[in-house]
Amino acid sequence: MEVKKLYLSLILLTFTFVGFAQQKISLNLNQVTAEELFRQIEQQSGYTIYCNPADMDSLLFSVQCVDELAPQALAKAFEGTAFQVSVYEGKQQLFVLKERSLVTSISDDYFYQRKELERGSSDYYLLNPMEQKATSENKVYTIGDETATTLPDKVQLTGVISDFRTGEPIVGAVIYEETTMAGATTDAYGYYSLSLPSGRQRLLIRGLGLKDTQRQVQLYGNGKLDIELEEEVYSLKEVTVTSERLARVQSTALGVERMQIKDIKNIPTAFGEMDVIKVVMMLPGVKSVGEASSGFNVRGGSTDQNLILYNNGTIYNPTHLFGFFSAFNPDLVKEIELYKSSIPSKYGGRISSVLEINAREGNKKEFTGQVSIGLLTSRVTLEGPIGEKTSFILGGRTTYSDWILGMLPEDSGYKDGKAGFYDLNAILDHKFSDKDNLYISGYYSNDRFRFDSDERYGYTNANASAKWRHIYNNRLTSTMTGGYDHYSYHTETRENPSDAYKLKFGINQVYGKFDFTSYITDKHTLDFGLNSTLYMLSPGTYTPNSDSSLVARDQIQDERALETSVYLADRWEITPKLSIDLGVRYTMFNALGPRTYTLYDPNQLPDETNGISTEEAGDWKSFKTYHAPEFRLSARYAFSSDFSIKAGANTLRQYIHKISNTTVMSPTDTWKLSDANIKPQKGLQVAAGIYKNFLDNTIETSIEGYYKTMEDYLDYRSGAQLIMNHHIETDVISTTGRAYGVELMLKKTQGKLNGWISYAYSKTQLRQDDPRVDDPINNGDWYNADYDKPHEFKFAGNYKFTQRYSLSMNCDYSTGRPITVPTSKYQYAGGEYVYYSERNQYRIPDFFRMDLSFNIEPSHHLTLLTHSMISIGVYNLTGRKNAYSVYYVAEGGRLKGYKMAIFGSPIPYVSYNIKF
Amino acid sequence: MKKKLIYWIVFLAIAISCISPYEPQGIESTEGLLVVEATLLAPYGTEVKLSRTISLNDMTYEPVSGEVKILSDDGVAYRLTETEKGTYTLEQEFVYRENVKYALDMILDGKHYRSEYVEPLRTPEVDALTWKYNEKYEQVDIMVTVSNPDVDVAYYQWKFKENWEVRAPNFGTHRWDPDARRVITNELDTPNNRYYCWAKDSSRHFILGSSEKFISTTIKDKVINEIAYGGSRLSNLYHISVKQYELDGEAYSYFRNLQNNVETTGSIFAPQPTEMKGNINNLDNPKETVIGFFVATTEITIEMYIEANEVPEMQVRGSDCLEVLKDFKGPQDAYDQGYGILTYGIGAPPEYMLMRCVDCTRRGGTKKKPEWWPNDHQ
């Protein structure tokens, strides 16, 4: 014991270094003194020998040996005596002690205790719970069974990377080993799975906004290593953050844009309100029809072809107040992912894009909150831990924009109007164990408008979901999700009691998803699973809204359908440079009764006059089934770690359609499920791209080109009545669409100046090629779609003067969208009327807008009770009256031409944000 | 219903937006298309107006002439006579025969046009023509109530003609005659005054109604005209004559589309304008666009008067017709500066007022009094 203590200070490492250069000696000694013996050995081998001379001055030694290691030779000399030889390899020292041996290293058990499981198991070994989170860069962590006799070639290392301060998992961090370039990116749960050679390894970890770090591991077998990373706070030096850029070049997916909330917070938007949807619209390939549009168009797709998911719930109307604000509280959003081209096999049901918005988990370490006050909206967020394993977030947002209506002129008659919205979020995250995690999310939003005590209009989004994540072993994980989505709107009038009415629409969905990810071998990762959604849609209910109203009650039959899919996808790394992603998704859609429907003469367009039979479907009986496979393929060839080319092809189908005859997503658009008369929409996209990063991955560039076709896209007929139409199939036509384009993007995400510039050229056209149509639009030729804007240039940039002051600017330029204009006029019924051109033959003037904002963070002390941020800016700096539409109105029987702009002048704003 | 929804959205946009006059450039004009406004009425009143579309920049309309007939499907043809260039009427009395359909037939510039054969419709009597003061918008709403027991769904069109007496706010005893260059006395008992005038107007757009959404064919209190505050219609006596026509569903859809194309297209949620096909075709070239819809129906007329003192809220108040000025060099000087005589006589200096306060011709009126006007104002 004393010896141990005595030599403790000499011990620096618990590892013995094997392989130190060892000298071999030869001895031929006869009856020599200890001193002579020692001298010979020391001379030949370089060792130093220690002893208590008093013990051996009377001894004489004889030893013969040839090419022996010094310790062995010395031991031979003392054989049969009471002396023992101890070796201290690290220092090339030998000790000769009477009847005792010197312990020259601390026992392996000294620092930790290991539980031994049965040998030969591939399960990992639990470290002491104290050691679960690897927080030190210098400590070497042992993974696996150290006492195993054989080391495997490859070892599977898994774990979760989380934020040191809040305990939240970190998404998109890259952990890799430099020499073999074996790497992995953490998924949505911060989970990574990495295959490495056994032995001593050094792993580098990079995460956006986090300090670059490393971990040392000694790998004996498969094991787990959870890592906590520190946030990179207030460092004035440049930070080399490469995870995002590596991710883009390395991944097989094309047309994917990932953004973290930090990227979103600095982009100036109208009224200083951080807006997730507006940021999405700044990305190349994403267009909108105009500033008041609540929908967006991705690569030539219409607004209903985007699947918008918020914590797995489908959102039908992603904005508040006609597109001025997004429906997502930015304080709760963690990241957004927009899939424009390669849509992963686990998603389906829309043919143009998937926008996935994921909320954060609550802070697991301490209770915090944020309050934000802006010109038009305010929000509050509270979060914190509940016990050791649970965390929560509550968020709320509301508007008080009535004041802007109060500014309207008296004689507009709408001075006393009210427009408002609020939304509420509640998230609960519970970790049962390392293997099981439950995430529950609830969202509710409500918009209501009341202009002059007459028209009232409102809509509601409500979503609830529960997600259970289970890790079976280090190669198989699964997520099971279930939820309920609801969207409804209503409009009502009361002014004239005789025709006061109320119109309601609603859609409900119940869904369940089982998603598995299996890291079968280090070359193949399989994703497979099953999704099922039950739709229940009420297309319209029209009721009288006063006692004396003569309105007849009318209701369109409810629609029900079940959409079930199974999918299987394989990410196959054929060689480290070439990897492909192959996926198949098979969907079956069943339209369910009760329903009474008409079948029409197939040789003519469905019309009230040519129905041939009326069918009835029973309750929950399937009366029409559509089923087909969808293919998702993409491939990447990486010439080097910063240069790759990719190509992909996807087919997709959509079974729910928005029926609208307005250019933008209007509040009264109706949705319809496919049934016996409405076929599913089909889409096909092929795309290819070149991706190169420059200057040590600080600048990302990409060029992507695509070609898309759409079939059975629903367009409406002339004079169509789309509201409360019992036979809406008689007012719509199947149209074909095509879109193609090229997108160029340059992105810089570090340094004082960061942001992106993009240019896109694209065309989107539609054609009515159904031969049954008598008088097709544009005579059956291709005509421009409403959102066809060939040239588009976008710039979003942020310049940090210091850590406290930064300037943000964005510019948006695009060709004017197509419109249908009058081309001549005539007299009728005592007034002037216009005759319109073929659809979308002309364009409104080009669109250009520039916004600027200045962000100030008054104080940066980490230990202050509250942190605040002020943002001052101008929206539409140049004040350009970007035409939203051009039209003619008859005034007093004469026509006058007008141009309407949404934001016709520069709009300054101030917003204030406190975090506590 | 949708119209109101869209209008308030437009007004929200006004607060922070701009609606500015604009003329799109580079439009390929579709002038020269045939426009046919044709209504067959029994017993009298049939009228067909022919014209062509003109470019948006032009101002004058050119009527079209040719041969116009009404055909019945049992072989009778009725020729219409051209009363004015481009306007054709049926002089004689016309009676609809049982189970007979009628079509419009025209030969213009060597091209032969014919409409589809339509079944004549019978227009019901108007149940009530009423008016109400609308406090919120400070206007008078003129409303119609009607029902039609003969059909399942009723579609109506209305037209109106207004005549009203314009009374100047003040009676000027004299006026300056710029041609004779002298002062003339205004006489209340002869037309030689500027106190009483008359004006007229008529409907300039489609006024349509449908009972599709209602429990019966009754449409109650449908506003067909609005008298805004500040005009001269209710300065003394107002008369409106409303004509009602029954339409069928196709004609209604066609006209409603035409009206929407000039009414709702500007707003954010405007539906895309489209052109619907009418029911008149060029027999040799069915692809030729012909604008218009031939309708065969009957006409029901109803009228009413509204007196100014029935609607005191509509009297123009707080105007500057209270200010009396005296310092002009003479009546000619006042006239040149836009002022007219209020009083003129020996003994006191003349008093002047803004011309439109003493002269009803400056308020949109003329001295042409309709023969049937029920009072003896001159």
Please give the residue ranges for each predicted region.
Chain A
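Surface-exposed extracellular loop regions of Gram-negative outer-membrane beta-barrel proteins
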Residues: 488-490, 536-547, 552, 590-613, ...
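N-terminal periplasmic "start-of-domain" segments of outer-membrane beta-barrel proteins
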Residues: 21-26, 48-62, 149, 154-156, ...
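Gram-negative outer-membrane beta-barrel transporters
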Residues: 706-709, 728-823
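Periplasmic N-terminal accessory/gating domains of Gram-negative outer-membrane beta-barrel systems
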Residues: 119-148, 185, 209-211, 223, ...
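Face-selective signature of the C-terminal outer-membrane beta-barrel domain
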Residues: 429-446, 458-603, 702-707, 748-756
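Outer membrane beta-barrel strand-and-loop segments of large Gram-negative receptors
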Residues: 509-513, 555, 563, 673-679, ...
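Short loop/turn motifs that connect adjacent beta-strands in outer-membrane beta-barrel proteins
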Residues: 289, 346-347, 362-367, 386-389, ...
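C-terminal beta-signal and adjacent terminal beta-strands/loops
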Residues: 804, 813-830, 847-851, 855-916
